Amino acid sequence: MSKFLDPKADLTFKKVFGEHKHLVMSLLNALLPLEEGRQIESIEYLQPEMTPRTPFSKDTIVDVRCEETGGRKFIVEMQMSWRASFKQRVLLNAAKAYVSQLPSGKEYHLLQPVYSLNIVNDTFEPDMEEYYHYYHMVHDLHTDKVLEGLHLVFVELPKFRPSS
């Protein structure tokens, strides 16, 4: 029996990254595709529960949710085993975090990007050798044209090698 807790286990993950700001900032800065000079320097934790505004919408809970002083929002999830619906759940959670920023009567330019970092202890893209998968909205023909808003990152732990 191991004398150490597995950091991938749900409660341990939430305890480590949900209560130690410097650790979650280090993780986010290391794994998110942040622009040069836009590293995260300060965060505040947000409630992990995202209650819908409409009565028949789904409640969702994430492992860690926080925002930085500049307004960017971050979601961190640890998923032990892959389910086909996980990508849709990630997209739903990120979209909810995005739209919840804008109360009625506020201007659209106030919306800040939402970054969702998802660490998966399973292989879900077996035909790809990369362990790091970054999704965001880009123009089909002109990939330098990006719609700011949702940034989804998935890390497949079984494919990761320290030399990667």
Located regions from the model:
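Elongated, amphipathic alpha-helical interaction scaffolds
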Residues: 1-164
